[in-house]
Amino acid sequence: RGDKYRRSNGSFMTRDEFNHHLSNMLSGLFSLGGQPDHILIEYCVQFDPIFDNVSYKGVPDIRIIVFLGYPVMGMIRLPTRLSDGKANLHQGAIGVGIDIPTGTTRRGVFGNEPVKEHPDTEHSIVGLKIPRWDELLLIAARAYELSGLGYVGVDIVLDKDKGPLILELNARPGLAIQIANGNGLLNRLQRIQALEAAGTLASDPEARVAYAKAHFATT
């Protein structure tokens, strides 16, 4: 707006502050090991209006854990005032477990506490149907061939105009998704490992999604 830039939390920074931030990025302030870095300018996501009542300022994202091509667990991360509009659980966002077969949210975690409502909007975060869920699962399953990673967290955002967009592929996704779902990953991973041992892993992403929907419900 004018000579100012709007942050994801709604606040503004001046052009000088913006230039200083870019300089910090290039100098490696935010990179692993403090090495000089590059800047990638991305499209500004306009998140789907279904999330209006359960998100504070920023863009919610959906993480799906994929093991050997099978989507085994999912959650949506909802920004809060505490997280400053960022969908980051370690900074105070809410993690909400998603039932793989139906794409419906089941339970949430805020810090270490179970929650059923967003702390800022006071709207329920339980029973929310994620739009285009089957498409999201298929995108996640295909990320296996795309990345070559046996275990990967696929982070997806839902844009109101462009639909599902991959935000990033995370080779070391955190384990808080288990708390958000009230289920551990081990049994699900072992089930896929059994398929691998039997030589029956599916090569078709659609078949892998169908298997996940049949076996990985979050109650």
Each model region followed by its residue ranges:
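Conserved N-proximal alpha/beta basic substrate-recognition cap immediately N-terminal to
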Residues: R1-K4, S8, A140, N170
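Intrinsically disordered, low-complexity Ser/Thr/Pro/Gly-rich regulatory segments
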Residues: V96-I125, L136, A140
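Short beta->alpha transition motifs characteristic of CBS
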Residues: R1, L78-P79, E168-P173
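Phosphate-binding site of ATP-dependent enzymes
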Residues: R6-V109
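Short amphipathic alpha-helical segments
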Residues: E17-H21, R132-I139
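Hydrophobic residue at the +6 position relative to the catalytic HRD Asp in the kinase catalytic loop
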Residues: V154-I156
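C-terminal active-site "lid" helix and adjoining low-complexity regulatory extension at the edge
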Residues: E117-E135, E145, L149, L158-T219
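Extended, basic/helix-rich recognition subdomains
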Residues: I64, A143-V152
